[in-house]
Curated annotation (Swiss-Prot):
The gene is kynA. It comes from the Bacteria. This is Tryptophan 2,3-dioxygenase. Homotetramer. Its EC number is 1.13.11.11. Its cofactor is heme. Heme-dependent dioxygenase that catalyzes the oxidative cleavage of the L-tryptophan (L-Trp) pyrrole ring and converts L-tryptophan to N-formyl-L-kynurenine. Catalyzes the oxidative cleavage of the indole moiety. Heme binds at residue 237. It catalyses: L-tryptophan + O2 = N-formyl-L-kynurenine. GO terms for biological process: L-tryptophan catabolic process to acetyl-CoA; L-tryptophan catabolic process to kynurenine. Binds 1 heme group per subunit. Pathway: Amino-acid degradation; L-tryptophan degradation via kynurenine pathway; L-kynurenine from L-tryptophan: step 1/2. Keywords: Dioxygenase, Heme, Iron, Metal-binding, Oxidoreductase, Tryptophan catabolism.
Amino acid sequence: MSNAPYDPATEGARMNFKGRMSYGDYLMLERLLDAQAPLSSAHDELLFIIQHQTSELWMKLAIHEIKAAMAAIARDDVQPAFKMLARVSRIFEQLNGAWDVLRTMTPSEYTLFRDKLGESSGFQSFQYRSIEFLLGNRNLAMLRPHAHHPELTAELESILAKPSLYDEALRLLARRGFFIGADGQRTDWRGTRAESAEVAAAWTSVYRDPQRHWELYELAEKLVDFEDYFRRWRFNHVTTVERIIGFKTGTGGTSGVNYLRKMLEIVLFPELWKLRTGL
């Protein structure tokens, strides 16, 4: 047996990438790894930046998958949407794990650079707002933090002009012969829809005969799976913030933990949760 170091070239691996696309070229790693610019000398600021930048990358993928799932549902091609929604759930499972890394930063360590953040805050995240709007939580007041970027505001308005993910699921219910009341006549999608007894009754019928309505049943469960992970992400956000800054006002001027706790009260797909009590 030779003690010589292993050389992948002996098995045909390419080792010279002059004039060829390498791993780093494809992923544009030079740009990506140059995108962290701490404003202080604090050791933990790099952790804080990377935590939020990687979250934004995962959110970009979540938006891609949610939009694709919505398009599939709208054209009655429901089964591909199951895979896409399952992937979104896994994305938020990944995002949940990321809080564990950020929680290794102590309050004392955060205070060393918190003042460098100015008024920047996670609630100003354009991609997070896009996800909320795509899911149907359409608080129009949250357009205002993006007013200084007309192109971002226009993109959010474009989302608001169309049905949400849940709206598309309800429209599918209607196309499959279920009565969904006022939701069947909606043409203005800008606001957050009201909970509906007719929609609850329709979903209850699906759950009482899942074999007959398998695609609708599976879609509903994929939506509940996702909201379950999304709720955990919100909860972990609250506990992480409370652990690090307590009940201080947030850098963006919100009430911090109290603001985040209010977000825990939002239910994206209310009828899908409430029907369980009556089954």
